[in-house]
């Protein structure tokens, strides 16, 4: 299956473009979670942690999830955004807000 992130080093380049994260500038980092939406939303009721920016509305998943980490390569410049694709199984941290409380 050539479409899975693990076998496709171009995954991030395609997905970042499709999700409009390369319009106007290159978004430097993005993580895609390959889990059911309900499982990602459930993280908002799991372990509360402090966000990187100091906010207190972040939560860490109880279990490892399948993710793809996309990071802009050092040599890429807008409009030719290029990304390194890394697949991993790890606990994710999401910021949550609203009612119902959902990832943002």
Curated annotation (Swiss-Prot):
Q: Where's it mainly located?
A: secreted
Which SUPFAM superfamilies does the protein's record reference? RNase A-like
Q: What are the alphabetically sorted keywords of the record? A: Disulfide bond, Endonuclease, Hydrolase, Lyase, Nuclease, Secreted
TM ranges are none
Top-level taxon:
Eukaryota
SS bonds (residue pairs): 12-70, 26-81, 44-96, 51-58
Q: Please provide, in alphabetical order, the Gene Ontology terms of the cellular component aspect for this entry.
A: extracellular region
UniProt-listed Enzyme Commission number(s): 4.6.1.18
Tell me which CDD domains the record gives: RNase_A_canonical
Swiss-Prot/TrEMBL GO biological process terms: defense response to Gram-positive bacterium
Q: Has UniProt tagged this entry with the keyword Acyltransferase?
A: no
Tell me the InterPro entries matching this sequence: RNaseA, RNaseA-like_dom_sf, RNaseA_AS, RNaseA_domain
What's the top EC group for this one? lyase
What are the protein's GO molecular function terms? lyase activity; nucleic acid binding; ribonuclease A activity
Q: Provide the catalytic activity annotation.
A: an [RNA] containing cytidine + H2O = an [RNA]-3'-cytidine-3'-phosphate + a 5'-hydroxy-ribonucleotide-3'-[RNA]; an [RNA] containing uridine + H2O = an [RNA]-3'-uridine-3'-phosphate + a 5'-hydroxy-ribonucleotide-3'-[RNA]
Which sites bind substrate?
27-31, 52, 71
The protein's location, in the record's own words, is: Secreted
Claim: Lyase is one of the keywords in the record: yes
- Subunit details: Homodimer; disulfide-linked.
Family stated for the protein in its record: Belongs to the pancreatic ribonuclease family.
Q: What is this protein called?
A: Seminal ribonuclease
Q: Give the species this sequence originates from.
A: Saiga tatarica
């Amino acid at each position: 299956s050539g479409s899975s992130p693990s076998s496709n080093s171009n995954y991030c380049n395609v997905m970042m473009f499709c999700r409009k994260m390369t319009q106007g500038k290159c978004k430097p980092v993005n993580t895609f979670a390959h889990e059911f939406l309900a499982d990602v939303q459930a993280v908002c009721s799991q372990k509360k942690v402090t966000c990187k920016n100091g906010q207190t509305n972040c939560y860490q998943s109880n279990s490892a999830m399948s993710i793809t980490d996309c990071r802009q390569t050092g040599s890429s410049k807008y409009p030719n955004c290029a990304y390194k694709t890394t697949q991993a199984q790890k606990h994710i941290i999401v910021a949550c807000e609203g009612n119902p409380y959902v990832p943002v």
